[in-house]
Amino acid sequence: FFCKFKKIKRKYDLIIDYITSSIEMHRWKKLINFFGKSHVLCVTRDFKIESEYFDYNFKNQKKFQNLYFFDLIKSIFKELFFGIWIVFKVSLKTKVNCFPIALNIINTYLFSKTLFENNKAKFLIQEKHYNTEPVKNYLFKKYGGLASTSIQKNIIALEPIFFYLDLDILFSLGEGGFKRAINYGGRIDLIQPVGSLFMERGWFDKNFKIKK
């Protein structure tokens, strides 16, 4: 565990979450420039790209790191006396090891609480609509966020990763093709067709000349 004691509060207009590669970061550059670099926080997962984008605001998420000490101690206390026994009972009843799931939920809660309590923003967006997290979205709204959003990266297939999406706004590829997400138990309050961010960065912005 790597913990922090001092809380430094910052304000942004937009937080871009779950950035996992330099290529993905490049796709967001136009949106970041629209808001202004100083008004956007980019959250990466287990890797650093600050050297490539030195004038952007970054925060790197690593499991159970950069958490606030008192939040961590409180969580450990509650889990030792209550949570661990609930998870153990459910694991026995279902014959499924639920401890990895519980650890993931705890990590999401602690990191999201630290992130949003000290980095307040109006909007939250991510590229991978299948990695939305209800706990994260709840805490984002609790600490003053207006809307958690995501682009639609690809078609919604019959796969478990597309189950139970949790979003205020989905920026969809088109006017259809997203009903499966609702049927799979997802919460999407508003669907706004905008097209493909991948197509924009990978095709339209490159000005290809097509010979007729």
Give the ranges of each region predicted by the language model.
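Catalytic-core helical/loop segments in enzymes performing group transfer/polymerization on anionic/lipid-linked
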Residues: 1-212
